[in-house]
């Protein structure tokens, strides 16, 4: 829907500049998301659950989820699919993106939603409210299921990085994938590389 006419492009031209993301920036952001996924989901969350710190575990779950959603949009190239939107619209946008043909990492949305359903029970020992949730949590503890989901997501991410030629490593701890992704960054600008 058109709100105003901009025949000369005075307003539209600068706005269009934001639709393009340089490849070096995209790769740098992918690397950063890999670092956050490793830190929040693979390293801190299991430690917080083991320690019994439900609030810290829930915070780690949130950070992992936000980084995973952002990474899915970055992998699918924001120029093609759009940027990850504001947090309250992220899952709706991720669901739409996941239903599109040829979407990379399309299964991440469903896995994240399952992880979030399990989070209350895993972090605070609060039983689920649905019969399906109660039945699904009796066999395997929710914390173990969340850790398995995280490892599955991370394995899928490594497979996608390999498919795109961004890594030659099999390592599923995502922090160790960062140097492989950053090898593809052409610019020497320090702001695009991890320490």
What residue ranges belong to the model's regions?
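Conserved nucleotidyltransferase catalytic core and NTase-mimicking acidic/glycine-rich helix/loop elements
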Residues: 2-195
